[in-house]
Amino acid sequence: KSLSTYTKYRIGCAYVGEFLQTHYHVKDIALKELSLPFITDYETFLRTDKHLKINSAMVFVRNLRAMVFRAIDNEWLVKDPFRRYEYKEEETTREFLSKEEIHLLMETPITRKKMSMVRDLFLFCCFTGLAFIDLYNLKEENIKEFFDEGEWIVIHRQKTGTEANIKLLDYPKQIMEKYRGLCEDGRVFPVPNYQSCMDSLKRLGKKCGITKPLSWHCTSHSKFFYLLNISELSIL
């Protein structure tokens, strides 16, 4: 599984533990006690106590379902408590960052060291389209020099397994050089854990005056937006 998936499962386990203590006043329950009311109460807990939007809540409900299915496959559980559960989702429009917002990220003075690093990592992904897990796994051996004498990222994307060849523009190369040599395991960047980066990213957005919620999903959309406006990309 990817690092982000692992992180979501860890957070989900913590949510279930908190739900059990606050609503049932126990630390755990037997698998056979899982029921439809338990699941709907857990969904309500996610949406009220944890203030999650419906689609985010469904991520953690589905993670719980995956664990239940594993229990059924291993014959630890006979009945499926999710059998009559109805999933709820809202249609969302994927956000991309505009040229002006990219400029705000690049030019807003940041004095806090960690926030500055997260900004660099985020902008590197904006210019390359790398997902967070691919940024985390990026190694020196993935940086190649091709026939055009330019540097390229050659990497297999973890989510899809497909190879990606990404030309490095000047700005992401500058970011890469800034952190090169800091990792002893051959990775290009000393990437903090996903949740820590997301926390810093939220504060970064507020600091820069960007109203859109920043996430690593924005980076790939921003990259394709700029590829479609290559003349504008050249003047960033």
Where are these regions (language model features)?
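Basic, Lys/Arg- and aromatic-enriched nucleic-acid-binding interface segment
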Residues: 54, 58-62, 77, 81-132, ...
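Short basic/aromatic active-site micro-motif
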Residues: 34, 59, 117-118, 191-195, ...
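N-terminal DNA-binding recognition helix of tyrosine site-specific recombinases/integrases
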Residues: 4, 12-22, 48-82, 133
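A Lys/Arg-rich helix-loop hairpin that forms a DNA/phosphate-binding surface
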Residues: 4-7, 20-44, 190, 216
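C-terminal catalytic core of Y-nucleophile DNA break-rejoin enzymes
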Residues: 157-177, 182-203, 209, 215
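Short, charged phosphate-coordinating catalytic segments
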Residues: 69-80, 125-149, 235
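Conserved tyrosine-mediated DNA breakage-rejoining catalytic core shared by Y-recombinases
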Residues: 86, 92-95, 101, 137-177
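C-terminal catalytic core of tyrosine-transesterase DNA break-rejoin enzymes
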Residues: 123, 127, 133-134, 203, ...
